[in-house]
Amino acid sequence: MAKDLDVNESGPPAARDYKDPPPAPFFDMEELRKWPLYRAVIAEFVATLLFLYVSILTVIGYKAQTDATAGGVDCGGVGILGIAWAFGGMIFVLVYCTAGISGGHINPAVTVGLFLARKVSLVRTVLYIVAQCLGAICGCGFVKAFQSSYYTRYGGGANELADGYNKGTGLGAEIIGTFVLVYTVFSATDPKRNARDSHVPVLAPLPIGFAVFMVHLATIPITGTGINPARSFGAAVIYNNEKAWDDQWIFWVGPMIGAAAAAFYHQFILRAAAIKALGSFGSFGSFRSFA
């Protein structure tokens, strides 16, 4: 296979100083026989459980502190800023802790985006999503068990479309919010960037967590911020409210579209995967330097 080249404006093209990892096999049954897969699945389950436990407790605590009927005040509690920090901060911590074991997905949309980019296999994708959803259900279940008097009264942290917004607006918010998150994941874990700066792999959880924080600031007033189907599904299962289930499709369809769009944009536009494939025919070889 020909060696890819980078642009060198002052002379001939220079040899690429990094190497892309080979694409993951689409379907690999051999993977099911290996312990590292199950270790990664367990890590995804536990990480998603902890993520939902801390973040949903934060949401319910904020609502309890600002409930005027219970003596709360409007300016009490952590506010939307604090809720956003809880979600973003937990993602930062958990991605940092699990990146070396499972990749630190903690989100079916991230897993699907990486699958579409051939970063993970179908087997791993399915097992991760199941583990993430089960972890989310257990995390919300613990919240209800420990805060039963507040859980149902304050909505169980379930994602619902806010009054005054139509479903199209909610869907758009979820698509764009998830695009921001998954695009950040691709950028933070880009092998080209990792090869050229040894600090990037260590710092990758920071921009990912910060992306979650920023998206929450923007979309909490609209949908309560999903951008993670497992988070929305787990809360809906434990809260079991009709409106939460009626709006549930928004928190699956939106994030999956956003993840697919981010995967396409990063792989085929920024990394020019399509041009590199066509370059093997010769006529497009000059475009390889832009990858």
Curated annotation (Swiss-Prot):
The keyword Magnesium does not apply. It holds the Pfam family MIP. Residues 1-22 are annotated as: Disordered. The modification N6,N6-dimethyllysine is found at residue 3. Residues 2-39, 96-125, 189-201, 271-291 are cytoplasmic. One of its GO terms (cellular component) is plasma membrane. The keyword Protein biosynthesis does not apply. InterPro entries: Aquaporin-like, Aquaporin_transptr, MIP, MIP_CS. It is found in: Cell membrane. A motif (NPA 1) lies at residues 107-109. Its main location: membrane. The modification N-acetylmethionine is found at residue 1. The modification Phosphoserine is found at residues 283, 286, 289. GO terms for molecular function: water channel activity. Belongs to the MIP/aquaporin (TC 1.A.8) family. PIP (TC 1.A.8.11) subfamily. Aquaporins facilitate the transport of water and small neutral solutes across cell membranes. NCBIfam families: MIP (TIGR00861). The Asn-Pro-Ala (NPA) motifs may contribute to the formation of two hemipores that could generate a narrow channel. This is Probable aquaporin PIP2-4. It comes from Arabidopsis thaliana.
